[in-house]
UniProtKB/Swiss-Prot annotation:
Keywords noted in UniProt: Activator, Early protein, Transcription, Transcription regulation
Classification via InterPro entries: Phage_lambda_CIII (IPR013056)
Function in brief: Presence of the CIII protein in the cell results in the stabilization of the CII transcriptional activator (a very unstable protein), CII activates CI, the gene for repressor, and thus promotes the establishment of lysogeny.
Family: Belongs to the lambda phage CIII protein family.
Pfam family, one: Lambda_CIII
Descriptive protein name: Regulatory protein C3
Record carries keyword Glycosyltransferase: no
Amino acid sequence: MIIAIAGSARMGVSQLHESLLDRITRKLRAGWKRLADILNQPGVPSHDYCAC
């Protein structure tokens, strides 16, 4: 099965899922890194990472 997405080349379903998995893992890694940065701060954590 081939899927066409606006602004990108035609790709097979396996490539579409692979890129989605890459995006998900990249966002998870970035989130874990932000959490580690927050937990490694001395004193009271700042709210730079929080959308509060």
